[in-house]
């Protein structure tokens, strides 16, 4: 392979244009060829463990200095750090992508418009996908693997903190895929190259930013290319009057404590007033033991004050707390009068990510799930389940809080679009227009494109 | 009903905010209630034919003056003009929308993640849809009907030339829908209100502009809200070496002449060199008789020159011709050496709208259909079939040349998104994480949400 420190010296614009050219032939690479290429990527990564670890160690060493300087958190450096077992699991992830069903060439509908005039709606790749991500070097491999599986060309922009790790991984990917149309995966590194990418709306079909809310917002404000990303995860757990309080406590604990830094962790608990005294006294103890800071509205404060077995002083929640993604061991709590009030609170302050109701009453659960406007609405389950792997989508390219194209955890399906294939026999629209227009049949039937006749 | 000349004096911002509130309850209006409201709209429009015609006559009279002044074309005024039969067909269109299958509440997939932990992907409305359209007053009714059927609130901005017609139709719609959450349909009229709409990215989920390419481009460049629209229809017909030339001539004639002003009319013919002399001599005569102006590349010019039976002088096509949507009785023609050259020409100059190959060779057709990057790819059929009604989608809200969310003719499906519903039994993610993680089942099954247990 080429020296791990080298990448192609083309400009970002040339790279994007090459990706655009590659996308046209990539879309027609057979399932077998795409899967073979994925397997080769996994093998090449495993063969180059030492080289990857060496490059990563240099990135990590530099990042550690930034922790001392107060620039990075230790958690950030942890996400950056690779190990032999982590690299093995990256290779394993690539193999699992190879094993997934082909998302391409699926006939979604087949419809006879008239005799010998048949319309097929068939899944195809989107084209060129621009991605910007941070920290974890495994993101580069995951995004590349999902793009290849779904027949898309991809522009990869990783964080500067992972530059050496990303270069080695990128070169492993290129080395493993000589059979894939050259140019299908492009690494860009400079900050100003992101601007170039965002401006190339003729060449790039979709931008997927993964990073801070403000960065995603910046991308949305600075491109006319469609953006798939999530801006915030202000998720709620609502403990209903009909909740099983033991279950509610366990779920609210998991939703906050199991991994507080992620977007599907809960930020605000809403508690029905009828169960608030009893629920809060249980919940507070558990959160306190886990070191979770509580910010409560006035009713929460007063309930906790009057529950003699709780010694906490509850910090007063302000308006800002209801829209804050803490990403940390902090939770805000509000007591509500009714199911409707809980729904209204969520629709006003939530970020349309993931919302959960705890109740033993199925009708109340259904009302909540219908009325709350969010990508994922849960009944008696932790918000932390909102994840592509847990949802059974295989690997995920991200979670979307937008409502267009793909919503919630996005898997391979979100990287495809469709194309209409019409098979005719010389039909003209004039036949179906005017006063003696021939009517259409519009009958759906079971057939997949391409249709193969026995006589060839 | 209120006086047809009055509309609500709220600001555009208030209207959009009200639509946002309405959208939350609109999404839960039952199928029957939405269909009843659609039927009431059709009835109310029919009851108010005289009032609609009166308002329309005033719009048309003003527009006629602009024709004399050279501002509008007669075709523009024709599109603006309503008649009793046109109004009846508008009412009929609304009834046909009522009759279509409900696009909402459909369970797209059901997957067991684990015992008593079931995930349902269910179709839901998008939310608030902003639309900007021109000329035809029937567009206002069509867009409103499709939005209501799909549970979306809608902001309607029509052209000033149809202001009086649009006001009456809008008031008919409001009068007919007192049972629909108030605020679901909002009419805005001022040019500056469009800017307000484009800026309200927290409240508006999708913008659908219908109009000139430059207007759609303007919208894309001036909002961070997702845009569904089409910028150009530069469609091609490729006459292959294996084409049935009689069929090819008939299809190329229909694709250009049957309705040249629309986006799915052909703009460029590509002709394989082996059939060019024979095809062009037939085609030229037919186009000449229909008054179609021909712009040919050098090879087309020389072939036509040497074909003694053609008296035409062919205008030389310039580079600009290959990317021009004439929308008129003008066609450009290029002779190509091969199927691959035709594909390359289309992928370089086309607008990803609709492309058709004429050939009797199924393998060559398949190669073309796979390799051409367009929303609709046709084999032996006129490009003019690219249309929601002809495709059997029912009414269409527009044709998308983008690749994200909805592509080609967009029907009710394009106005929906989905929501993940997870039904659990108190599950925590901690159970499925770490070294002794419980594995997921991820088994798909047939069931629709909401699941009703017999015991309530």
Curated annotation (Swiss-Prot), chains A, B:
Gene3D superfamilies: Aldehyde Dehydrogenase, Chain A, domain 1, Aldehyde Dehydrogenase, Chain A, domain 2. One of its GO terms (molecular function) is NADP binding. Pathway: Amino-acid biosynthesis; L-proline biosynthesis; L-glutamate 5-semialdehyde from L-glutamate: step 2/2. Pfam families: Aldedh. SUPFAM superfamilies: ALDH-like. GO terms for biological process: L-proline biosynthetic process. InterPro entries: Ald_DH/histidinol_DH (IPR016161), Ald_DH_C (IPR016163), Ald_DH_N (IPR016162), Aldehyde_DH_dom (IPR015590), G-glutamylP_reductase_CS (IPR020593), Glu-5-SA_DH (IPR012134), GPR_dom (IPR000965). It is found in: Cytoplasm. Keywords: Amino-acid biosynthesis, Cytoplasm, NADP, Oxidoreductase, Proline biosynthesis. Its EC number is 1.2.1.41. It catalyses: L-glutamate 5-semialdehyde + phosphate + NADP(+) = L-glutamyl 5-phosphate + NADPH + H(+). The keyword Oxidoreductase applies. One of its GO terms (cellular component) is cytoplasm. Its main location: cytoplasm. Catalyzes the NADPH-dependent reduction of L-glutamate 5-phosphate into L-glutamate 5-semialdehyde and phosphate. The product spontaneously undergoes cyclization to form 1-pyrroline-5-carboxylate. Belongs to the gamma-glutamyl phosphate reductase family. This is Gamma-glutamyl phosphate reductase.
């Amino acid at each position: 392979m080429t020296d791990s420190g080298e990448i192609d010296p083309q400009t970002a614009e040339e790279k994007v244009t090459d990706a655009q050219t590659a996308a046209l032939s990539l879309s027609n690479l057979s399932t077998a060829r795409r899967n073979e290429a994925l397997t080769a990527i996994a093998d090449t990564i495993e063969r180059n463990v030492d080289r990857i670890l060496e490059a990563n160690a240099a990135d990590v060493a530099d990042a550690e200095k930034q922790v001392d300087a107060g620039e990075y958190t230790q958690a950030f450096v942890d996400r950056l750090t690779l190990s032999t077992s982590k690299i093995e699991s990256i290779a394993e992830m690539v193999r699992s992508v190879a094993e997934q069903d082909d998302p391409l060439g699926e006939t979604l509908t087949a419809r006879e418009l008239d005799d010998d005039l048949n319309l097929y709606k068939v899944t195809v790749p989107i084209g060129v996908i621009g991605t910007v991500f941070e920290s974890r070097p495994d993101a580069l491999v995951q995004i590349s693997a999902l793009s290849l599986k779904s027949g898309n060309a991809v522009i990869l922009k990783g964080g500067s903190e992972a530059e050496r790790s990303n270069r080695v991984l990128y070169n492993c990917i290129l080395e493993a895929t000589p059979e894939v149309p050259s140019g299908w995966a492009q690494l860009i590194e400079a900050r100003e190259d992101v601007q170039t990418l965002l401006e190339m709306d003729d060449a790039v079909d979709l931008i997927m930013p993964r990073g801070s809310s403000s960065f995603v917002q910046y991308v949305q404000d600075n491109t006319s290319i469609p953006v798939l990303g999530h801006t915030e995860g202000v998720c709620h757990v609502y403990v209903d009057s009909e909740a099983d309080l033991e279950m509610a406590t366990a779920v609210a604990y998991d939703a906050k404590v199991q991994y507080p830094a992620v977007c599907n962790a809960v930020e605000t608990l809403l508690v029905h007033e009828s169960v608030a005294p009893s629920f809060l006294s249980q919940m507070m103890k558990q959160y306190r033991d886990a070191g979770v800071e509580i910010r409560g509205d006035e009713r929460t404060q007063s309930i906790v004050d009057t529950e003699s077995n709780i010694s906490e002083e509850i910090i007063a929640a302000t308006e800002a707390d209801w829209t804050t993604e803490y990403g940390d061991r902090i939770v805000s709590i509000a007591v509500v009068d009714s199911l409707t009030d809980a729904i209204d609170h969520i629709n006003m302050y939530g970020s349309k990510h993931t919302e959960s109701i705890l109740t033993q009453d199925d009708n109340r659960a259904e009302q909540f799930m219908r009325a709350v406007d969010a990508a994922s609405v849960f009944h008696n389950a932790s918000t932390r389940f909102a994840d592509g792997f847990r949802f059974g989508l295989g690997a995920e390219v991200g979670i979307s809080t937008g409502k267009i194209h793909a919503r919630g955890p996005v898997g391979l399906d979100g990287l495809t679009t469709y194309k209409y294939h019409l098979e005719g026999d010389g039909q003209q629209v004039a036949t179906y227009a005017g006063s003696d227009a021939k009517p259409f049949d519009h009958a759906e039937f079971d057939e997949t494109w391409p249709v193969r006749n026995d006589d060839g």
